[in-house]
């Protein structure tokens, strides 16, 4: 039962972008709707959990939420250019590398020889995985498609910065996840509005995309529930499995077309990235 709870964040988070794309509306309406969904869920959780909200918790939570919105908005823009099945493995790999390096440099997470060896192997696996999932078909090598890929990667780098700050600012100030949930959601909505208001995102698609926001917040909640039961290392490792759902869902559910060579690269690349996530989880423990 505990392992099942720990897998739920991966299931929920892995399906978010599939819902975003299926519900439609483009990256701006999708971002805004998702943030409102997260806010609704967080308000309900706050009513039942009643965590203590200090000025530090509120401030840090809002900043974290603002940067989450930056990460999510740019991830969705990249999906618009490159598709789910290509964007998500690369995005996951970049997030793992950035958060790992930050953890090593700032928090000195790799304190033993075993953790250093596992960590370095994990980073190598991530690089291999990202390269394999980025393989282009001959058709995609034309000028327009190649331009979309380059722009998508640049946008993903911005997204990675957003997700990195979203994660590490909470840890830097040692803020409890339950306490940060509501302020985070407020920051997400503020960030969503600031990033999208010029593009007139307030429409029926924004309302539809409240659903992915509810799903994201539920995944967050199950992560908080599972961590004390299975440990941070195991919950972190299992949460990376969402890449399977999002990537294969992009191909099977959204109908993104891939050559046999690309499919092989994606499957093998996912295996490398998941292996890296597991090794990083062990290195953190």
UniProtKB/Swiss-Prot annotation:
Principal location class: membrane
Membrane topology designation: Multi-pass membrane protein
UniProt keyword list: Cell membrane, Membrane, Sugar transport, Transmembrane, Transmembrane helix, Transport
Keyword Aminoacyl-tRNA synthetase tagged: no
GO molecular function: carbohydrate transmembrane transporter activity
Record flagged with keyword Oxidoreductase: no
SUPFAM superfamilies the record matches: Multidrug resistance efflux transporter EmrE
A single Gene Ontology CC term: plasma membrane
Compartments where found: Cell membrane
Residue ranges crossing the lipid bilayer per the database entry: 4-21, 26-48, 52-71, 84-106, 110-132, 153-175, 180-197, 210-227, 232-254, 266-283
Source species, domain of life: Bacteria
Family: Belongs to the GRP transporter (TC 2.A.7.5) family.
Entry function: Involved in the uptake of glucose.
Protein name per its UniProtKB record: Probable glucose uptake protein GlcU
């Amino acid at each position: 039962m505990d392992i099942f709870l720990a897998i739920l964040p991966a299931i929920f988070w892995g399906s978010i972008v599939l819902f975003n794309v299926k519900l439609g509306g483009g990256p701006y309406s999708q971002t805004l709707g998702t943030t409102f969904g997260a806010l609704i869920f967080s308000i309900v959780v706050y009513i039942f959990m009643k965590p203590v909200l200090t000025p530090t918790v509120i401030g840090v939570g809002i900043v974290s939420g603002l940067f989450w919105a930056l990460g999510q908005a740019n991830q969705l823009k990249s999906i618009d250019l490159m598709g789910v099945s290509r964007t998500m493995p690369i995005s996951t790999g970049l997030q793992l590398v950035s958060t790992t390096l930050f953890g090593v440099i700032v928090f000195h997470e790799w304190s033993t020889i075993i953790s250093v060896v596992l960590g370095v192997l994990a980073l190598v696996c991530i690089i291999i995985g990202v390269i394999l999932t980025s393989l282009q078909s001959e058709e995609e090598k034309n000028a327009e498609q190649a331009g979309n890929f380059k722009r998508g990667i640049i946008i993903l780098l911005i997204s990675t910065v957003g997700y990195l700050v979203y994660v590490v600012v909470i840890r830097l100030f040692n803020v409890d996840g339950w306490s940060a949930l509501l302020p985070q959601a407020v920051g997400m909505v503020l960030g969503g509005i600031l990033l999208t208001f010029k593009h007139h995102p307030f429409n029926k698609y924004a309302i539809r995309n409240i659903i992915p926001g509810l799903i994201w917040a539920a995944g967050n909640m199950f992560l908080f529930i599972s961590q004390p039961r299975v440990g941070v290392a195991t919950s972190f490792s299992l949460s990376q499995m969402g890449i399977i759902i999002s990537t294969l869902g992009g191909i099977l559910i959204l109908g993104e077309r891939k050559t046999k060579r690309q499919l092989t690269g994606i499957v093998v690349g996912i295996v490398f990235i998941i292996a890296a996530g597991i090794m990083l989880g062990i290195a953190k423990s």
